Amino acid sequence: MDNELLLLSSNDIPFLEAQVNIHQPTLSEISLIGEESFFSGCQFLNFSKSILNLEDKTDLEDRSDFEIFMSIMCSSEKLDYKNNAMMVLTLLFPTSQIKFMPNELVLMNKNGLSRINSANFDAFKDIIVSMFELNDLDTGGGYNPADSRAAKIAEKLKKAKNRKAQDSPHKVAILSRYVSILAVGEQKDINDFMHYTVFQLKDEFKRYQMKQSFDMYVQAKMAGAKDLDEVDNWMDDIHP
């Protein structure tokens, strides 16, 4: 989505295609489910066949991303992944009851019913990708769909996840690390960051990194250093 000011405002995001607002959870709210569960759930909600190789795409060419997603969510073999996605959905729609139907996800609240289905699933993913900047994220993931064809894809993704886990066995601690760095670097109360959204935190962290690099570059130039690589102006746009 192309509305940086709305994302920075921490206001709810209108999901017009489903006639419902998507809540931007704060770090304090996310902490209730933990970063690992949060990012695992986000990856499920952002499922796309585009991550698959040509052979796998061909095998599932008659299935939409939403259909594969629903087969994953309806699987009872790996409840942890389904639960992670459900917890994220609860953060996104805190005033709604969430129910999975055969061909749609139904949100029930005081304003009536809203539906996420094959017609608006891409729009939904576009919003959460922007909210959480998921294109910058690589924490591994797992899929275990009920459908036999999708299950083949799940096995390959599971193997890829296991390889990543062996290369980087540490637990996911992206947001907490950002908070810790900014609290020290900017000399702020660490509790202040708990009211930030993910987009606000990442925006400030990127800007802080750019300013640190820019200030070091200027200081080095003033001290007479030569042959330095140019750095971006810290006030440049950071959201492509």
Q: Model-flagged regions — what are they?
A:
Residues 78-157:
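Long amphipathic alpha-helical segments with strong coiled-coil/leucine-zipper propensity
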Residues 70, 76, 214, 218-221:
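Aromatic-enriched hydrophobic runs in primary sequence
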Residues 62-85:
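Extended, charge-biased low-complexity segments
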